[in-house]
Amino acid sequence: MYKKILIRYGELVLKGKNRTTFIKQLGSNIKEILNTEYEMEFDRMYIPYSEENLKNLKYVFGISSFSPVIETNKNLEDIQSAITKLINKNASTFKIAARRNDKSFELNSDQLNNLLGGFVLKNSHLKVNVKNPDQIFNIEIRKNSVYVFDKSINGIGGIPVGISGKVLHLISGGFDSPVAAYLLMKRGFKVDFLTFVTPPQTDETTIDKIKNLTKVLSRYQKESNLYVCDFSLISSYIEFTEFKSFKIILMRRSFYRIASELAKQNEILMISNGENLAQVASQTNESMAVIGSSIKNEILRPLLTYDKNEIINLSKVIETHDISILKSKEACELFAPKNPVTKPTEAKTLRIESKLDELKTYEEIVLNQKMKKFAI
């Protein structure tokens, strides 16, 4: 019955001079994620109808809504025939919503509403209710075809992945960082991932968990990378510092310096993470400022103001929850001190780092010799 799926751009039509670029990126993403061709018009796109395409459109950012449509010719009998195919036996009331985009068509929208409404009244059990109908028959008169449909499915909104460039995202096995990655994609970032492990304390189970999380997230983008960094050389070195309360601050500053160099190698400008204000000791205002001061890159924190319940609920929506809830050994948790500093200063942190003579050398070794890359 259905021949095509009509896709509406939503936010993209508001982007002025960048509009064409946004829509081309959306088309490219649809082609990659759904492995299908598309037809593009000013305010919408069409792809071939299939149940698989209908299901997978929920993974494409930049779509306001979409509808499976019957495509028919520009004559009244064919339009009536299409409406007949859509009549729902469980509905009691209906409304006709005609839209004449092609002004050369002989009937205007009001005339179409009246004629087609009369047809449905005469040829079905349905009664008219324009305020709260059970079923709405939408008829769009376009230049080359007429499209008839009775449902509109919400897309996930946002803007197309890739339009905002790339970001290197620090991911762990918890709830927060996968959700943060999703939100970055929603604002047009293509995301590469970096995770830190400390074998033998963290084993292959932990790495597999991270890989599985990135695979779920890869439904929203194609051809990204996961970098797995063996951080054990540095974690062992920092473990024996006399300033025990600063261990996590020192580790995370080291994380960011390594991430910054990796981003530079891959021509990525920004670093991101799943940090949430005041959730743990390293996420106080002072801690984040000191950790962030270790690099010049902009650090994006999409979850900064989210409640934990909001994060968990979103993880269920994007289907990372059931992976994140599995037990694993995270680097920061394994080496967290009993009494971590919550209000560090940059001056004191720099004094401590100045006493760690081998830290810079170890960071270079880890970056160049202890990094594995996986295509997702």
Swiss-Prot record:
Pfam families assigned to the protein according to its UniProt record, in alphabetical order: ThiI, ThiI_fer, THUMP
Record GO terms (molecular function): ATP binding; CCA tRNA nucleotidyltransferase activity; tRNA binding; tRNA-uracil-4 sulfurtransferase activity
EC number, as in UniProt: 2.8.1.4
Superkingdom to which the source organism belongs: Bacteria
Keyword presence, Transferase: yes
Gene Ontology BP annotations: thiamine biosynthetic process; thiamine diphosphate biosynthetic process; thiazole biosynthetic process; tRNA 4-thiouridine biosynthesis
Reactions mediated catalytically: [ThiI sulfur-carrier protein]-S-sulfanyl-L-cysteine + a uridine in tRNA + 2 reduced [2Fe-2S]-[ferredoxin] + ATP + H(+) = [ThiI sulfur-carrier protein]-L-cysteine + a 4-thiouridine in tRNA + 2 oxidized [2Fe-2S]-[ferredoxin] + AMP + diphosphate; [ThiS sulfur-carrier protein]-C-terminal Gly-Gly-AMP + S-sulfanyl-L-cysteinyl-[cysteine desulfurase] + AH2 = [ThiS sulfur-carrier protein]-C-terminal-Gly-aminoethanethioate + L-cysteinyl-[cysteine desulfurase] + A + AMP + 2 H(+)
Binding-site residues for ATP, renumbered to this chain: L170, I171, T195, F196, R252, G274, Q283
Class of enzymatic activity (EC top level): transferase
Keyword annotations from UniProtKB, A to Z: ATP-binding, Cytoplasm, Nucleotide-binding, RNA-binding, Thiamine biosynthesis, Transferase, tRNA-binding
Compartment annotation: Cytoplasm
Any single GO CC term annotated in Swiss-Prot or TrEMBL for this entry: cytosol
Pathway listed: Cofactor biosynthesis; thiamine diphosphate biosynthesis
Domain THUMP: from-to ranges: 51-152
Known role: Catalyzes the ATP-dependent transfer of a sulfur to tRNA to produce 4-thiouridine in position 8 of tRNAs, which functions as a near-UV photosensor. Also catalyzes the transfer of sulfur to the sulfur carrier protein ThiS, forming ThiS-thiocarboxylate. This is a step in the synthesis of thiazole, in the thiamine biosynthesis pathway. The sulfur is donated as persulfide by IscS.
HAMAP family referenced in this protein's UniProt entry, alphabetically: ThiI (MF_00021)
NCBIfam families membership: tRNA uracil 4-sulfurtransferase ThiI (TIGR00342)
Sequence similarity: Belongs to the ThiI family.
Protein name: Probable tRNA sulfurtransferase
Organism from which the protein derives: Mycoplasmopsis synoviae (strain 53) (Mycoplasma synoviae)
Name of the gene this protein is made from: thiI
